[in-house]
């Protein structure tokens, strides 16, 4: 099916190949008449991307996420990321602490926010889900003719996580008015229209599969993923 990545077997029947240097490789069937985009050029395209990742959540809603391997341990554990930053600041091994005091103050003022989602997970108020963990626009294939979202790709980082992580990382880049690496911060703003478009697409596909608490904390994910990448 065009909507699914199909892994090709090796001559030995394995799902991957290990070369002489220990590197792992795998191949998937080419999905014809599709293309990918680095950014969304319209709210409609952003809505379609939200629908694609929302469908990903819906289709895997009953999959036992705790059986998945954690490819990158503590990947979106924001409190752990904060602790790493605090420890690095104390060591100040490169002697550059004085150059980033304003940035550190910004993060420290938001320390309490870092643990909001992880605390809810630990209290069983948020369910552990199968998450993609790289929900950027370029990881969706679109039909060249119709413009419809066809397939979510780049599954190397699929592992246990929270729905808010995937939603939030999409918003971090998708609802921004500037590129991710923009150095002129006067150009970087949050677009509410883009946020609404993505959210409509995402909840249109995943809404019924999510709990009320999950839906309510999706915007928190957007805030935390932005803070985490800044950390």
Task: Give short role names for the model-derived ranges.
Residues 57-60, 86, 111, 115, ...:
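A structural signal for well-ordered alpha-helices, especially hydrophobic packing surfaces
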């Amino acid at each position: 099916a065009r909507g699914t990545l199909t892994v090709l077997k090796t001559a030995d029947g394995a799902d991957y190949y290990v070369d002489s240097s220990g590197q792992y490789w795998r191949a998937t069937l080419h999905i014809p008449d599709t293309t990918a985009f680095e950014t969304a050029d319209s709210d409609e395209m952003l809505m379609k991307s939200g629908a694609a990742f929302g469908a990903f959540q819906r289709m895997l809603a009953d999959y036992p996420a705790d059986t998945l391997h954690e490819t990158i341990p503590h990947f979106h554990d924001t409190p752990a990321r904060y602790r790493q930053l605090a420890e690095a600041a104390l060591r100040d091994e490169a002697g550059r602490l004085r150059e980033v005091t304003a940035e550190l103050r910004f993060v420290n003022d938001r320390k309490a926010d870092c643990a909001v989602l992880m605390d809810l997970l630990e209290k069983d108020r948020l369910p552990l889900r199968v998450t993609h963990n790289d929900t950027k626009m370029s990881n969706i294939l679109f039909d060249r003719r119709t413009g419809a979202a066809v397939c979510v790709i780049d599954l190397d980082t699929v592992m246990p996580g929270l729905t808010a992580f995937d939603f939030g990382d999409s918003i971090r880049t998708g609802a921004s008015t500037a590129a991710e690496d923009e150095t002129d911060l006067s150009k970087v703003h949050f677009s509410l229209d883009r946020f609404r478009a993505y959210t409509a697409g995402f909840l249109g596909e995943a809404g019924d599969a999510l709990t009320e608490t999950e839906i309510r904390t999706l915007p928190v994910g957007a805030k935390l993923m932005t803070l985490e990448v800044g950390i």
